[in-house]
Regions:
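Generic recognition of cysteine residues
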Residues: 61, 74, 130, 164-165, ...
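Extended alpha-helical regions
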Residues: 56-59, 69-90, 219, 227-245, ...
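Charged, non-catalytic interaction/linker regions at domain boundaries
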Residues: 94-372, 379, 506-571
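N-terminal accessory alpha/beta regions
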Residues: 31-133
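Amphipathic, oligomerization/interface secondary-structure segments
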Residues: 3-56, 325-573
Length: 573
């Protein structure tokens, strides 16, 4: 592997990390070392103030922070070093666990001061240091031996993920970043990599917010309410100015003028059109919050017209990651399947949960406002996992059983994704699975594919070659699930109890929907598999299946077991 190969990996990986259709395991991560420090600071504040009730929330965030701190070489420590910081974190966890769910006030304030100091020292410089680190890793002149291929790419991969996180943290939208790096990859002007990389660095380090005009089209059901809203809210107009109308050539619907149509027009500054649309939508929401009587029957818009000096374009308010489970090509008929379950399965408890969850999934999918989506997806998940005993915490059951369901299916899901990926590249025949190929056939395919695919295949091969490696692979996935489920629950509490709306709600909502849909599909598979059961089934049988299977797969950790003992069928997308 030479320098040009590594540079090609950078281009391919940036596009993959930012693409909405990429498997969640390969998309940009939730945090880098800077964003996790910021998140930890907010969690410590909430812990001090009593808004966070469980030390476990703090504990999980510290564990995640330690992992990122340990890997990162760009972060600057003002008056301590990495080892001392990790020791301080360990000491705080040990002292706090002794107090159970009581706050160590002095220790928390000291740690909060330390975290805030490190965050402040790195907040404005991390992007440049991360780009410089990547450039250093991409400029290695000597050929890299095959034995060092995966470790070398692992290191580059960490900083690519950190860079993507940093772009998002600083206020870029994922859709803008994807478009930018797609052009970078395609390189239709044949610009040398060093020149293109330097230009990219200059663009992002010197980038400033631009001026945009954002227009939402409002369709009222009541013309009296439309006029009242126009009179009360300064940004609502009956028709767009002549200058704007003249500039609109491809969106004629924005030129309509009648008693029921109004336009919400706001001027905003932002780094790109995706972000400015979301910021303008927040303004629209805030104005409507104080004028409820005028917008009772108004459906919130999901798109906007965005204008600046050089273009006019339509933008969605929110871009969600792909709903479709991309490891399976065809979905099964949901309605017919549900009918057969009703007719053939003794499972009133599970069916009631399934129907309620499906109802809230549908309601969530139909919502424009992100808070309503999130809450309905969470309600649906609670319907599935709730205990009939009020003394049992639904969240504790979600945190215990949801990772078991997902970890049992993780290996098979990822292999099916690899299969589909390789078939798309015309190097794997239909009905053939990567895991069943001989080592010789695998080597042939590895020699035919691009460097990103080669890396994926070698990583998968290494993880599947020995039981201990596979166990570690599953354990890491479970840890990440526990971190993220705890994060989702914290955001749920903030949304419900504090009416707080977070910038990362879109990504978290996409993740929550994936967990919900995957669980629902597994629940349907469970009912189909047990259609001839003479025993009345309830949710404990479904959860118990995965609890036992999880224990078994930890002991008998073979590819054959992972592939044969779970079904990944798609009824809901």
């Amino acid at each position: 592997m030479n320098k040009e190969d590594i540079q090609e990996y950078f281009k391919l990986r940036m596009v993959e990390a930012l693409h909405k259709d990429t498997l969640d395991s390969f998309r940009v991560r939730t945090n880098n070392v800077i964003s996790i420090l910021h998140e930890l600071s907010k969690i410590l504040e909430g812990w001090l103030e009593g808004n966070i009730k469980r030390f476990e929330t703090v504990d999980f965030c510290i564990k995640e922070a330690k992992e990122l701190i340990d890997k990162d070489e760009c972060i600057v420590f003002s008056f301590l070093n990495k080892q001392l910081l990790k020791e301080e974190l360990d000491s705080y966890i040990a002292n706090s666990r002794q107090k159970k769910n009581e706050v160590d006030t002095a220790g928390t304030k000291q740690l909060l001061f330390l975290i805030d100091t490190i965050y402040s020292s790195n907040n404005s410089i991390y992007l440049e240091k991360c780009i410089e680190k990547i450039h250093e890793l991409l400029s290695f002149e000597a050929d890299i031996p095959d034995a060092e291929f995966v470790p070398t790419i692992d290191n580059i991969n960490y900083y690519i993920s950190s860079l993507c996180c940093e772009f998002l943290r600083l206020g870029y939208s994922k859709v803008y970043l994807y478009t930018y790096f797609k052009v970078f990859l395609e390189n239709k002007k044949n610009i040398p990599f060093e020149t293109a990389f330097s230009k990219m660095k200059e663009n992002f380090l010197s980038n400033t917010e631009k001026d945009f005009t954002v227009i939402f089209k409002l369709e009222f059901q009541d013309k009296v309410a439309a006029q009242r809203a126009t009179n009360k809210i300064k940004n609502i107009v009956e028709e767009l100015s002549l200058d704007i109308q003249k500039s609109i050539t491809r969106q004629p619907s924005y030129k309509i003028s009648n008693a029921f149509i109004r336009y919400y027009v706001v001027n905003k500054k932002a780094l790109d059109t995706g972000i400015v649309t979301r910021l303008a939508y927040e303004d629209l929401s805030n104005d409507f919050d104080f004028n409820l009587e005028d917008i009772a029957n108004l459906k919130m818009p999901s798109t906007a017209l965005v204008i600046n000096d050089s273009f006019i374009r339509n933008e969605k308010v929110y871009y969600f990651d792909n709903k479709e489970d991309i490891v399976v090509t065809e979905s099964q008929p949901l309605g017919e399947t549900i009918y057969n379950i009703k007719q053939n399965t003794l499972s009133k408890d599970i069916q009631d949960r399934l129907y309620s969850a499906l109802r809230h999934l549908r309601i969530g999918d139909q919502q424009t406002e992100i808070e309503q989506r999130f809450i309905n997806y969470w309600i649906a998940l609670e319907f599935i996992f709730a205990s009939p005993r009020s003394s049992e915490s639904t969240f504790e059951r979600i945190k215990k059983y949801l990772p078991e369901i997902l970890e049992c299916c993780y290996v098979k899901r990822n292999i099916l994704y690899i299969n589909k990926w390789l078939r798309g590249k015309k190097v794997l025949k239909d009905q053939t699975s990567w895991d069943t190929l001989s080592d010789k056939d695998k080597e042939v395919i590895i020699g035919q594919v691009d460097i990103l695919t080669k890396y994926r295949l070698l990583k998968l091969k290494a993880r599947m070659c020995h039981k201990d490696k596979t166990k570690e692979y599953i354990k890491n996935h479970r840890n990440n699930l526990e971190y993220h489920i705890t994060r989702i629950y914290r955001l749920r509490n903030e949304l419900i109890h504090e009416a707080a709306i977070k910038q990362d709600m879109v990504n978290v909502t996409s993740n929550l929907r994936f967990y919900l849909v995957f669980t629902l599909n597994q629940l349907i598979v469970f009912l189909i598999e047990r259609k001839d059961s003479t025993r009345e089934l309830d949710i404990s049988h479904f959860l118990g299946k995965f609890n036992i299977l999880s224990k078994y797969l930890k002991k008998e950790c073979t590819i054959n077991n992972f592939m044969s003992m779970v079904s990944i069928d798609k009824f809901i997308i």
